[in-house]
């Protein structure tokens, strides 16, 4: 059990976090090609978010420095985790912190870095969410009531890997940031 605890950086892990950590350890022991890559990886926390159609999305929050290591094995790891947890889409996101905007009344000790601003964190969440695919364009549509809908255009070369998850991406992004978003994969007509 101590090896399961070592995969989770949380003090009091939930039942779902323990199940995912156990799956990580099972994958380490069963597949030799993933063993070296999975050993140093840890999870900060996991959230389960409801998506339309009775599906759920498992959002695994990982430390920011470990994100590049996760990207190396993300396609294989996602496939294996989705086999173990059916009817759930697995999404890896880095745990990022947003610092409040400095005001006149608050004492400013250090200048707020660009990477900790709300806009930068939301853009990085979007990039992490659609990782194997690249974002090729963004459009903002303003509705009559003043609401905004962001349209994100994804690269069409990875349609098979990502097409079935687009609704999950929309629900997760809306839940985490409060912004409405629509994903679109433009068709290649040459």
Swiss-Prot record:
Main location, first listed in the record: cytoplasm
Taxonomic superkingdom: Eukaryota
Molecular functions (GO terms): structural constituent of ribosome
GO cellular component assignments: cytosol; cytosolic small ribosomal subunit; nucleolus; small-subunit processome
Annotated coiled-coil segments of the chain: none
Phosphoserine found at: 10, 31
Positions bearing N-acetylserine: 2
Covalent cross-link site, Glycyl lysine isopeptide (Lys-Gly) (interchain with G-Cter in ubiquitin): 83-84
PROSITE patterns on file: RIBOSOMAL_S7E (PS00948)
Subcellular locations according to the entry: Cytoplasm; Nucleus, Nucleolus
UniProt keyword Ribosomal protein, yes or no: yes
Function field: Component of the ribosome, a large ribonucleoprotein complex responsible for the synthesis of proteins in the cell. The small ribosomal subunit (SSU) binds messenger RNAs (mRNAs) and translates the encoded message by selecting cognate aminoacyl-transfer RNA (tRNA) molecules. The large subunit (LSU) contains the ribosomal catalytic site termed the peptidyl transferase center (PTC), which catalyzes the formation of peptide bonds, thereby polymerizing the amino acids delivered by tRNAs into a polypeptide chain.
Subunit structure: Component of the small ribosomal subunit (SSU). Mature yeast ribosomes consist of a small (40S) and a large (60S) subunit. The 40S small subunit contains 1 molecule of ribosomal RNA (18S rRNA) and 33 different proteins (encoded by 57 genes). The large 60S subunit contains 3 rRNA molecules (25S, 5.8S and 5S rRNA) and 46 different proteins (encoded by 81 genes). Interacts with snoRNA U3. uS11 interacts with MPP10. Component of the ribosomal small subunit (SSU) processome composed of at least 40 protein subunits and snoRNA U3.
Family membership: Belongs to the eukaryotic ribosomal protein eS7 family.
Protein name in the entry: Small ribosomal subunit protein eS7B
Organism: Saccharomyces cerevisiae (strain ATCC 204508 / S288c)
């Amino acid at each position: 059990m101590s090896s399961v605890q070592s995969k989770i950086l949380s003090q009091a892990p939930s039942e779902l976090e323990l199940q995912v950590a156990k799956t990580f350890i099972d994958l380490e022991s069963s597949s030799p090609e993933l063993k070296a890559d999975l050993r140093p990886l840890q999870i900060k926390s996991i959230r389960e978010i409801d998506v339309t159609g009775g599906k759920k999305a498992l959002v695994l929050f990982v430390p920011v420095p470990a994100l590049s290591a996760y990207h190396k094995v993300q396609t294989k790891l996602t496939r294996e985790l989705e086999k173990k947890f059916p009817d759930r889409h697995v999404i890896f996101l880095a745990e990022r912190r947003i610092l409040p905007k400095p005001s006149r009344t608050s004492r400013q000790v250090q200048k707020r870095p660009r990477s900790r601003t709300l806009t930068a964190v939301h853009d990085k969440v979007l990039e992490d969410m659609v990782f194997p695919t690249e974002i090729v364009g963004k459009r903002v549509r303003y509705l009559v009531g003043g609401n905004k809908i962001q349209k994100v255009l994804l690269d069409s070369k990875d349609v098979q890997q990502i097409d079935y998850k687009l609704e999950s991406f929309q629900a997760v992004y809306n839940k985490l940031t409060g912004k409405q978003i629509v994903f679109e994969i433009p068709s290649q007509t040459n």
